[in-house]
């Protein structure tokens, strides 16, 4: 039954991955591997993504695989999420608002023994999505203009299988083994705006795949009579990605291709690499009512992309803080049993891009989040809602700033699959 459930979820997840795409509208995703997504569930997103020290029996925390061992020995947990939102891009006095919507993740967790558990699922790794253009004067022609259109789309997904175990009380170890795969397409078109004119088209496609490993540990101990502290740490080594890049430049007229200027395919096992990632976290819980979390992460993106002619990867630092409060888990009142979550996080973008003068500039990203967890009738399963506000601030004037408002909806089913029935 374990293998059948695993096969069912993974097969469905791969099919859904092919459709996930509209999660970002950012011109900055043109560079590198796109916008990097945090590997967090709906519940932990409301905590700012702080989860390295989180160890709960009813939450799938794939950010630290050591947490899997906390699952109850007689339950099966399935968690999936979807999001919708709006992005607002600003450049000078110009604003552009666009709607977003996307499948986010599907994960499951179940025990193998009392001290070991397995998790599997599909999560986004990066996404690319942008549409923008500019109109410029045609050199040598009075009152003539041409338009340059840019468009990009695609995503990379993380299909993982993980396990966690508890060799002795309070100390847990875990590992995720992931397959990263996806495709991204970039198109640039020059339109001269006259009937019968030639239209240059520049097409680029990146297809990449590879493996990723995450290892984690957690150690929990009592802090006072009713408090508990859990320390967490994770590490992911830098591994190569197999990549294929296709470059196609042509000139069209109407619906026909006049000439092809370039048609190249480049394959490599070293053009792109996964970054080294190091994370430390702490969680403090009190009387099953209050939960406080904090994370620090350092991701070594430098030297992970060989082609730095357009942009340069830099090492990334990220912090996250979160808090969760439950008034009374045993109350008959739904409002008293609900979880109220809050979080904040900040990071620098892992790519630096040139400004108008050609100087490489970075950007900072800050996120505020809030959410609720609504227990279902069985008091084991949950409806999770998270609202996030994200702001991307470039470190140079004149560059595009971005604001995102996103609502994520999650369903977390906790089923008693492995309990023995007693017949009278």
Where do the PLM segments sit?
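Subset of outer-membrane beta-barrel
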Residues: 20-424
């Amino acid at each position: 039954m374990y293998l059948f459930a695993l096969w069912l979820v993974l097969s469905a997840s791969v099919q859904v991955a092919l459709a996930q795409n509209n999660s970002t509208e950012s011109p900055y995703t043109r560079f590198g591997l796109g916008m990097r997504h945090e590997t967090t569930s709906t519940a932990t997103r409301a905590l700012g993504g702080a989860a390295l020290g989180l160890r709960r029996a009813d939450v799938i925390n794939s950010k630290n695989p050591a947490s899997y061992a906390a699952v109850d020995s007689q339950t099966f947990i399935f968690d999936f999420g979807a999001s919708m939102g709006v992005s607002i891009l600003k450049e000078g006095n110009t604003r552009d608002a666009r709607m977003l919507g996307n499948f986010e993740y599907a994960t499951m967790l179940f025990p193998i023994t009392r001290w070991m558990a397995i998790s599997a699922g599909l999560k986004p790794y990066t996404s690319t999505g942008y549409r923008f253009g500019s109109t410029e004067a045609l050199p040598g022609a009075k009152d003539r203009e041409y338009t340059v259109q840019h468009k990009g789309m695609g995503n990379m997904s993380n299909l993982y299988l993980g396990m966690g175990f508890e060799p002795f009380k309070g100390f847990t170890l875990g590992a995720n083994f992931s397959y990263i795969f996806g495709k991204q397409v970039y198109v640039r078109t020059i339109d001269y705006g006259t009937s019968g004119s030639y239209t240059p088209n520049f097409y680029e496609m990146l297809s990449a795949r590879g493996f990723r490993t995450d290892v984690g540990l957690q150690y929990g101990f009592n802090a006072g009579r009713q408090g508990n502290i859990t320390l967490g740490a994770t590490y992911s080594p830098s591994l190569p990605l197999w990549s294929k890049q296709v470059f196609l430049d042509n000139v069209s007229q109407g619906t026909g291709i006049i000439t092809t200027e370039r048609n190249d395919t480049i394959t490599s096992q070293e053009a792109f690499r996964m970054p080294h990632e190091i994370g430390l976290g702490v969680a403090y819980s009190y009387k099953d009512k209050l939960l406080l979390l904090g994370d620090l992460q350092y991701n070594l993106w430098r030297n992970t992309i060989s082609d730095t002619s357009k942009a340069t990867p830099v090492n990334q630092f990220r912090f996250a803080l979160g808090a969760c409060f439950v008034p009374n888990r045993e109350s008959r009142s739904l409002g008293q049993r609900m979880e109220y979550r809050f979080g904040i996080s900040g990071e620098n973008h892992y790519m630096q891009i040139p400004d108008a003068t050609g100087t490489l500039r970075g950007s900072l990203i800050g996120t505020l989040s809030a959410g609720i967890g609504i227990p279902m009738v069985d008091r084991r399963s949950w409806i999770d809602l998270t609202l996030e506000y994200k702001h991307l601030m470039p470190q140079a004037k004149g560059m595009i700033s971005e604001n995102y408002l996103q609502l994520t909806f999650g369903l977390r089913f906790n089923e008693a699959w492995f309990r023995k029935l007693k017949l009278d």
